[in-house]
């Protein structure tokens, strides 16, 4: 009798080259989990069917890179926001642009469709939230309360509320009919990246860069619980459709949470890097991530994931396995009711001005004429969108779940998709023959051309930096070559190992030095010690800690850090640039008004040593900020996340010009 085939819990479904340039955003359709939209620096929106290699439709019209995307609940419409602040809505069934919406003054950071009405909400780097009527192609309401970029917007399931998350560390709940903030949730110590409503209960979840997930009661307006001490910032969360648990997408892992009390039900290792969006369908979770121009999709079999009951990983408190308390309160929390038809659209809307309510018609008409929906694959397009226009059949057609591949070998723990595991990639690859055994590399007859390195090395990458993959791959067949011995193969594998160990040992020693200074002295001396090591990686590690606590920043600390920030902003490593931008933003928000006020103040009568010292520090900081402002101005034209960060810094530094 044949043994039962053991299938994988998580596996890589597909990898595609989605754009001719870097991918800047993507989104999954939540209804079927089979529709994927990607936006790129090439100013295009490409629509894909998950697990199919070819682009179904390419939407053009934007003139700047795509910053945010959203697909409607019925997967009939798609909205895209660009770097310039323009918004375009396409009808996927009709394959044409529906509306062009203008009004924001900066990048579009977040978008969401109203669940019932023809409305779209948009959040921007300009801190405004706007509600648009797609049918009338105008802004019907503008919500102003946030002080920094609005990173996520979500309508409540009944369509009456709107939740917004922003870089100002707050989550706000808006009453659409009244046009005002119902409540402001505070508690996060870092930018809030994502919010999600529970599908049925009055419960809201928020994830932040402070590496916590907070659950908020929307009836009593208080925090229900908080999941802390995650390893990475929280950027992607999703409630299970039945509301039994919350999924958190983290760096190379999926975590399953409960909230009353806070606990982690399960952890599944998935090699998806920084996952960008999640969707649940047919008891499978689909996750998508992107790196440069490629998009990867992954599947997790939820039937093999613990979603309630036992707590295999224990409560998230001091990393100790505790007994599971009896859940309380969830059965008493109110549930959403679908509003009547008259409530499906906001009431008491205010039109501040006719010019704001409507976009300029001549410019809009021209943009809509230039916007196109290019059908790249007619067969897939008809299969996905045309059946909606046909007569419904009974029972209706339902997409089958993705088949799980078998395990490579028997194991006891849940296996992740391994980096070296062969994966079927359906993008065309150059044809070449590879031998089955290692062979000696051919002796080069001439000096090889150096490989061009990227101008910016991304934080998420598929291969180590500084290692040549060709050293570890089989070479082409050559009759004059002899097969490598096992010793020679191991020698190639170990190549560079000693160098890496020396680098890590030196870095560890430097960090120990900084930690020793920090434990016996103040923050400025710790930063001085980090700068003295002449190792930017140590400075980055220290700044990543300091950036989490704004109260640690002092004026004398700025004089030491600003020269290092200037170096970080010009680094080729993305993570260094991100840390430099975060530190500079904190300095500008906390100290730039103080610096300008002190420099503009008239000289005092008599001798004031304290004031003279403060004036000297302010002059030094001002000079350094002027130097950095030139770098920020030159880089503000970049596309993608870097460009957004530099443009925000450029706005904050406008007073220096």
UniProtKB/Swiss-Prot annotation:
Polar residues composition bias: residue spans: 325-345
GO cellular component: centrosome; cytoplasm; katanin complex; microtubule; spindle; spindle pole
Gene Ontology biological process terms in this record: cell division; microtubule depolymerization; microtubule severing
One Pfam family recorded for the sequence: WD40
Region (Disordered): 318-410, 423-454
Entries under SMART domains matching the protein: WD40
Family matches, as PROSITE patterns: WD_REPEATS_1, WD_REPEATS_2, WD_REPEATS_REGION
InterPro entries to which the protein is assigned, alphabetical: G-protein_beta_WD-40_rep, Katanin_C-terminal, KTNB1, WD40/YVTN_repeat-like_dom_sf, WD40_repeat_CS, WD40_repeat_dom_sf, WD40_rpt
Start and stop residues of the WD repeats: 18-58, 61-100, 103-142, 145-184, 187-226, 229-269
Molecular function via GO: microtubule binding
Assigned keywords, A-Z: Cell cycle, Cell division, Cytoplasm, Cytoskeleton, Microtubule, Mitosis, Repeat, WD repeat
Top-level division of the source organism's lineage: Eukaryota
Location in or out of the cell: Cytoplasm; Cytoplasm, Cytoskeleton, Microtubule organizing center, Centrosome; Cytoplasm, Cytoskeleton, Spindle pole; Cytoplasm, Cytoskeleton
Biased composition (Basic and acidic residues): 351-385
Description of how the protein assembles with itself and partners: Interacts with KATNA1. This interaction enhances the microtubule binding and severing activity of KATNA1 and also targets this activity to the centrosome.
Known function: Participates in a complex which severs microtubules in an ATP-dependent manner. May act to target the enzymatic subunit of this complex to sites of action such as the centrosome. Microtubule severing may promote rapid reorganization of cellular microtubule arrays and the release of microtubules from the centrosome following nucleation.
Classification via PANTHER family: KATANIN P80 SUBUNIT (PTHR19845), KATANIN P80 WD40 REPEAT-CONTAINING SUBUNIT B1 (PTHR19845:SF0)
Family: Belongs to the WD repeat KATNB1 family.
Name of protein: Katanin p80 WD40 repeat-containing subunit B1
Species per Swiss-Prot/TrEMBL record: Gallus gallus (Chicken)
């Amino acid at each position: 009798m044949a043994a039962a085939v053991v299938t994988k819990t998580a596996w890589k479904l597909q990898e595609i080259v989605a754009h001719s340039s870097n991918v800047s955003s993507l989104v999954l359709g939540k209804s079927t989990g089979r529709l994927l939209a990607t936006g790129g620096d090439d100013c295009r929106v490409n629509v894909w069917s998950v697990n199919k290699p070819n682009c179904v439709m390419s939407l053009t019209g934007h003139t700047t890179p795509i910053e945010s995307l959203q697909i409607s609940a019925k997967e009939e419409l798609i909205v895209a926001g660009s770097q310039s602040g323009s918004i375009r809505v396409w009808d996927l069934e009709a394959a044409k642009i529906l509306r062009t919406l203008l009004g924001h003054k900066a990048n579009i950071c977040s978008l969401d469709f109203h669940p019932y009405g023809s409305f779209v909400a948009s959040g921007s780097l300009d801190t405004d939230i706007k509600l648009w009527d797609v049918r009338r192609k105008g802004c019907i309401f503008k919500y102003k309360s946030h002080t920094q970029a609005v990173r996520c917007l979500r309508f409540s399931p009944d369509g009456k509320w709107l939740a917004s998350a922003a870089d100002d560390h707050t989550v706000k709940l808006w009453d659409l009919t009244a046009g005002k903030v119902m409540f402001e949730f505070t508690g996060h110590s870092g930018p809030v990246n994502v919010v999600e409503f529970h599908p049925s209960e009055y419960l809201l979840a928020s994830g932040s860069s402070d590496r916590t997930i907070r659950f908020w009661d929307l009836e009593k307006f208080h925090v229900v619980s908080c999941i802390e001490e995650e390893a990475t910032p929280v950027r992607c969360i999703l409630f299970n459709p039945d509301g039994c648990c919350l999924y958190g997408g983290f760096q190379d892992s999926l975590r399953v949470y409960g909230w009353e009390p806070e606990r982690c039900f399960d952890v599944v290792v998935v090699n998806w890097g920084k996952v960008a969006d999640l969707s649940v369908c047919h008891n499978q979770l689909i996750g998508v991530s992107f790196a440069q121009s490629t998009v990867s999709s992954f599947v997790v079999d939820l039937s093999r994931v613990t979603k309630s009951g036992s707590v295999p990983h224990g409560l998230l408190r001091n990393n100790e396995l505790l007994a599971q308390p009896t859940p309380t309160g969830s059965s008493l929390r109110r549930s959403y009711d679908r509003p009547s038809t008259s409530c499906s659209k906001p009431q008491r809307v205010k039109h501040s001005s006719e010019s704001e309510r409507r976009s300029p018609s001549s410019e809009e008409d021209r943009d809509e004429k230039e916007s196109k929906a290019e059908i790249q694959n007619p067969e897939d397009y008809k299969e996905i969108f045309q059946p909606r226009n046909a007569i419904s059949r009974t029972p209706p057609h339902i997409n089958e779940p993705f088949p799980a591949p078998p395990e490579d070998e028997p194991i006891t723990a849940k296996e992740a998709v391994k980096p070296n595991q062969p994966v079927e990639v359906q993008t065309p690859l150059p044809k070449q023959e590879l031998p089955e055994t290692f062979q000696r590399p051919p002796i080069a007859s001439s000096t090889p051309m150096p490989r061009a390195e990227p101008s910016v090395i991304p934080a998420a990458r598929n291969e180590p930096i500084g290692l040549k993959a060709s050293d570890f791959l089989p070479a082409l067949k050559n009759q004059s070559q002899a097969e490598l011995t096992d010793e020679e193969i191991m020698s190639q594998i170990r190549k560079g190992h000693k160098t890496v160990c020396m680098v890590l040992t030196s870095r560890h020693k430097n960090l120990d030095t900084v930690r020793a200074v920090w434990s016996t002295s103040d923050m400025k001396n710790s930063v001085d010690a980090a700068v003295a090591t002449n190792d930017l990686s140590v400075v980055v590690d220290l700044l990543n800690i300091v950036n989490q606590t704004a109260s640690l920043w002092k004026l004398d600390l700025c004089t030491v850090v600003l020269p290092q920030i200037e170096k970080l902003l010009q680094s080729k490593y993305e993570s260094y640039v991100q840390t430099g931008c975060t530190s500079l933003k904190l300095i500008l928000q906390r100290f730039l008004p103080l610096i300008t006020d002190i420099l503009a103040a008239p000289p005092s009568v008599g001798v004031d040593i304290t004031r003279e010292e403060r004036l000297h520090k302010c002059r030094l900081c001002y000079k350094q900020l002027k130097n950095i402002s030139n770098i920020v101005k030159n880089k503000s034209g970049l596309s993608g996340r870097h460009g957004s960060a530099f443009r925000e810094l450029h706005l904050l530094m406008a007073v220096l010009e």
